[in-house]
Amino acid sequence: MTEKPTYLTREGRARLEAELEHLMTVERKQIAERIAAAKELGDISESGEYEDAKKAQALLEGRIRELKHLLSRAEIIDEDQASTGEVRIGSSVTVRFEDDGSEETWTIVGSAEANPRQGRISNESPIGAALLGKRVRNKVTVHTPSGVMKLTILKVR
């Protein structure tokens, strides 16, 4: 079975690559130094410092593997294609909530870049998935864990 791609903007890929580089060069070295310092204290069988450093190392290596895996499947979003009038990954979408008339603007991104607080929602989220393929003036009903939302698309960029 082929794995699905990780959709990233150019900025998103650059951020993940920078994080990976930092983890591999700076963080690894710091943790190795912590482990070495704990070993110098003597008996490591009951050393809290040693155990903490080894746990930090395991978490770090897990994140490094995760980033490498994400980047190996990266498919860069063509931002020129995002402005076709149809909601796609990379589009910025302004919607109006039918229940109260409020408006919200989101950018549809891949799950690795999603950050709802920054207005970046995943194409795999209920709202993101419901908006994909839609156009201005389309009405969209979204089933979310907190209930049903009715939206009207006002702008697609």
UniProtKB/Swiss-Prot annotation:
It comes from the Bacteria. Keywords: Coiled coil, DNA-binding, Transcription, Transcription regulation. The keyword Transcription regulation applies. GO terms for biological process: DNA-templated transcription elongation; regulation of DNA-templated transcription elongation. GO terms for molecular function: DNA binding; RNA polymerase binding. Residues 47-75 form a coiled coil. Necessary for efficient RNA polymerase transcription elongation past template-encoded arresting sites. The arresting sites in DNA have the property of trapping a certain fraction of elongating RNA polymerases that pass through, resulting in locked ternary complexes. Cleavage of the nascent transcript by cleavage factors such as GreA or GreB allows the resumption of elongation from the new 3'terminus. GreA releases sequences of 2 to 3 nucleotides. PANTHER family: TRANSCRIPTION ELONGATION FACTOR GREA (PTHR30437:SF4). HAMAP family: GreA_GreB (MF_00105). Belongs to the GreA/GreB family. This is Transcription elongation factor GreA.
